[in-house]
């Protein structure tokens, strides 16, 4: 059974934060290719002159001690991330995030960037080529970094930067193929085959798979986008 686990510490905190806990469910739908919505990125080949400076795009919110989300091998395709915003043209150089631990062998994550038009309730993937990150087995917290394989410019606007669980060891996937039949003892014995991310109290989006739409949630995973801002 697919699971998106948020530990009880966060659940308690969200119960106290009524303004967050009572936030209505919001779903964004993918913009069609002929959509007139202003959701776009700038062309790769454009060269920008004038003032520029190094900058980080981050909108993490409050880190809640002990709060984390866990993915297991049956969560392939699931996404979670952070929303960032730029007021000027921005060239992405790297994207970083923390992993608390990982027990899944040969785990591969990919990063996509979705331009958001929250007024029209739409989003659009602006990347031609996703960024991939191979995650080693980890017993302690580690920062991971992904780099674009091509020039990536963002127009002024809001973006959902998402991490997706893409692939893992074939034998591990086979082990998890019948997990709906497991009893509690079996599930507990397999629980080490999971990856854990820290969570921050600031709204973002998630979705269970590429065929699903983005759904707003009151937490994010604290991604940081580093690059060059042009003015």
Regions found by a protein language model. Give the residues of each.
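Beta-sheet-rich sandwich/jelly-roll-like modules and their strand-loop junctions
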Residues: 40-116, 158, 164-231
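Bacterial Sec-dependent N-terminal signal peptides
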Residues: 1-25
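Secretory N-termini
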Residues: 148-150, 156-159
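Solvent-exposed serine/threonine-rich low-complexity stretches and specific carbohydrate-binding patches
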Residues: 124-138
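Short aromatic-acidic-glycine turn motif
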Residues: 115-123
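Exposed aromatic-hydrophobic patches
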Residues: 141-151
């Amino acid at each position: 059974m697919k699971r998106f686990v948020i530990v009880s510490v966060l659940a308690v905190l969200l119960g106290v934060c009524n303004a967050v806990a009572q936030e209505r469910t919001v779903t964004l739908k993918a913009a069609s290719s002929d959509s007139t919505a202003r959701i776009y990125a700038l062309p790769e080949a454009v060269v920008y002159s004038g003032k520029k400076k190094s900058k980080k795009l981050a909108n993490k919110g409050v880190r809640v001690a002990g709060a984390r989300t866990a993915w297991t091998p049956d969560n392939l395709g699931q996404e979670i991330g952070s929303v960032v915003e730029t007021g000027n043209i921005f060239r992405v150089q790297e994207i970083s995030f923390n992993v608390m631990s990982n027990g899944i062998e040969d785990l591969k994550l990919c990063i996509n960037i979705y331009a958001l038009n929250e007024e029209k309730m739409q989003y659009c993937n602006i990347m031609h080529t996703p960024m991939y990150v191979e995650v080693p087995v980890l017993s302690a917290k580690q920062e991971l970094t992904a780099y674009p394989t091509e020039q990536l410019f963002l127009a002024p606007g809001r973006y959902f930067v998402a991490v997706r669980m893409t692939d893992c060891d074939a034998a591990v996937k086979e082990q998890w193929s019948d997990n709906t039949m497991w009893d509690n003892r079996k599930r507990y014995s397999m629980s080490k085959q999971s990856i854990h991310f820290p969570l921050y109290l600031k709204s973002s989006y998630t979705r269970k798979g590429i065929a699903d739409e983005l759904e707003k949630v009151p937490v994010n995973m604290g991604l940081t986008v580093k690059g060059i801002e042009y003015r």
